[in-house]
From Swiss-Prot:
GO cellular component, one term: cytoplasm
Protein name: Probable alpha-L-glutamate ligase 1
Keywords: ATP-binding, Ligase, Magnesium, Manganese, Metal-binding, Nucleotide-binding, Protein biosynthesis
Gene Ontology biological process: protein modification process; SOS response; translation
Sites where the protein binds ATP: 141, 178-179, 187, 211-213
Cofactor note: Binds 2 magnesium or manganese ions per subunit.
Residues the record lists as binding Mg(2+) 1: 248, 260
InterPro entries listed in its UniProt record: ATP-grasp, ATP-grasp_RimK-type, ATP_grasp_subdomain_1, RimK, Rimk_N, Rp_bS6_RimK/Lys_biosynth_LsyX
Protein source organism: Shewanella amazonensis (strain ATCC BAA-1098 / SB2B)
Annotated residues for binding of Mg(2+) 2: 260, 262
Stored SUPFAM superfamilies: Glutathione synthetase ATP-binding domain-like (SSF56059)
The keyword Magnesium is annotated on this UniProt entry: yes
MF terms (GO), sorted A to Z: ATP binding; metal ion binding; ribosomal S6-glutamic acid ligase activity
Cofactors that this protein relies on: Mg(2+); Mn(2+)
Amino acid sequence: MRIAVLSQGPELYSTRRLVEAAKERGHEVRVINPLECYMNINMRASSIHIAGEELPIFDAVIPRIGSAITFYGCAVLRQFEMMGVYTLNESVAVTRSRDKLRSMQLMSRRGIGLPITGFANKPSDIPDLIEMVGGAPLVIKLLEGTQGIGVVLAETRKAAESVIEAFMGLKANIMVQEYIREANGADIRCFVLGDKVVAAMKRQAAPGEFRSNLHRGGSATLVKLTPEERSVAVRAAKTMGLNVAGVDLLRSNHGPLVMEVNSSPGLEGIEGATGKDVAGAIIAFIEKAAHKKPKQTGARG
């Protein structure tokens, strides 16, 4: 097969591992920076170009699109879809999962466990918003934040009001969530591939920190999932329409709660913590799925 990896960073661990795994299984693979692509959109022969070169037809595309380039990256991914190329995660699913509020709304409709979440526009609604999520302490999240950036733990009601007012004053979109104290600064990253969890790790926040992201100094260890946790992770990924997803769970007193569904989950932490060849599993999945239609979201684009 001829496989393209859409990535801005050929030197990044996840990109390198996908390239290695594809080559080990006998495939031709090329890393393509989506920002270097431009598109010819027409009814007869749509195409994608880089620096005057028309790209060849690929059998499959693996999107590794950073959040900062979601719009353009997904436009390029969608162009591949229009050309009939199999994409591991479809553009519509990537776009959907990048909208944190929409993700929460979709999962709540499916009955998937979530922290109580509030969203408002007017400062006058702040007191009621805080009450809705159970009062302080509570978590305030920028909808555009990634890797723990833009996530604040407000330990008192006064602090919560001040932070929410400040974000609203900056016209930043935020959501407010209940703080799951019993999680003790830990979450579980479930790596979902197709209809099963192929690897999972527990991420523990660094001392004095409540965010467990590895980019924030958290540590990762192997974890054994319960059947319910596996089921919730797979259902969350399917709700987003993702074939590959990193689903972050919190263990609460009333069962697993989904914090986030990531459409471009990193491989370094999960492979390091579990010792599993996740990159190889992804390529094996593509080998089986690339020729199947219709795709998971049921529509191209």
